[in-house]
């Protein structure tokens, strides 16, 4: 399989791998909550976050109260129904992303944003720690104007909080409207539940997100 000459750069959509029409097959139920993965219940909402390797990210969110399901997948790129091998080539444009399905009556998008900002380094560009490549970029993919507004506001708040702690690096988090989300292979789903001693590179920078109504 061809690979990008520099996996730390974004891929031109015209140069992306073509992918396939058939989605990858995943287990119908979540290994931790036992809730069905599809369809998303009508009273639930969805959030998409990229914070580096999706194994640790998915565990972070399924451990939170009132989370219905989490799923590891790929989004933000061009290739349809990509495989993990294709993602690692740097020729799909996708990031490793976790889809969170939650009940907005019991949990808030603001709370999910707080977990997002405080549990990874959003100023590393196309990497997260020792994991290097565009697939590991920091990203928020929004599904509504309200989510988009909150995501942008939270980025501004977190940037100020970083500066107050003498961290003047610019945040590189991508915030865009969500495109297609493609489920990762089944062995990636709830990986750290199935493999408790598995790799997890997740870690924050010691900065807290201020309340959204605070300057």
Swiss-Prot record:
GO terms for cellular component: cytoplasm. It catalyses: L-methionyl-[protein] + [thioredoxin]-disulfide + H2O = L-methionyl-(S)-S-oxide-[protein] + [thioredoxin]-dithiol; [thioredoxin]-disulfide + L-methionine + H2O = L-methionine (S)-S-oxide + [thioredoxin]-dithiol. It holds the Pfam family PMSR. GO terms for biological process: cellular response to oxidative stress; protein modification process. The keyword Cytoplasm does not apply. The active site is at 53. InterPro entries: Met_Sox_Rdtase_MsrA_dom, Met_Sox_Rdtase_MsrA_sf, MsrA_MetSO_reductase. Residues 1-27 are annotated as: Disordered. Keywords: Oxidoreductase. Its EC number is 1.8.4.11. One of its GO terms (molecular function) is L-methionine-(S)-S-oxide reductase activity. NCBIfam families: msrA. Belongs to the MsrA Met sulfoxide reductase family. This is Peptide methionine sulfoxide reductase MsrA. The gene is msrA.
């Amino acid at each position: 399989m061809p690979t990008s000459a520099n996996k730390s750069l974004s891929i031109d959509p015209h140069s992306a791998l073509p992918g396939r029409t058939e989605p990858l097959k995943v287990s119908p139920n979540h290994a931790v909550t036992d809730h069905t993965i599809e369809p998303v219940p009508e009273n639930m909402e969805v959030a998409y976050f990229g914070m580096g390797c999706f194994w640790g990210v998915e565990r972070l969110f399924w451990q939170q109260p009132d989370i219905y399901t989490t799923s590891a997948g790929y989004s933000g790129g061009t290739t349809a129904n990509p495989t993990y091998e294709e993602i690692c080539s740097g020729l799909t444009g996708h990031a490793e992303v976790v889809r969170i399905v939650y009940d907005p009556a019991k949990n808030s998008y603001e709370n999910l944003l707080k977990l997002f900002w405080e549990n990874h380094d959003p100023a590393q560009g196309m990497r997260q720690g020792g994991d290097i490549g565009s697939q590991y970029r920091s990203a928020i993919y929004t599904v509504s104007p309200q989510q988009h507004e909150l995501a942008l506001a939270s980025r501004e708040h977190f940037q100020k909080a970083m500066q107050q702690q003498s961290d003047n690096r610019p945040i590189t988090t991508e915030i865009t409207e969500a495109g297609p989300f493609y489920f990762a292979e089944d062995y990636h789903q709830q990986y750290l539940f199935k493999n408790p001693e598995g790799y997890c590179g997740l870690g924050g920078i010691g900065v807290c997100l201020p309340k959204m109504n605070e300057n």
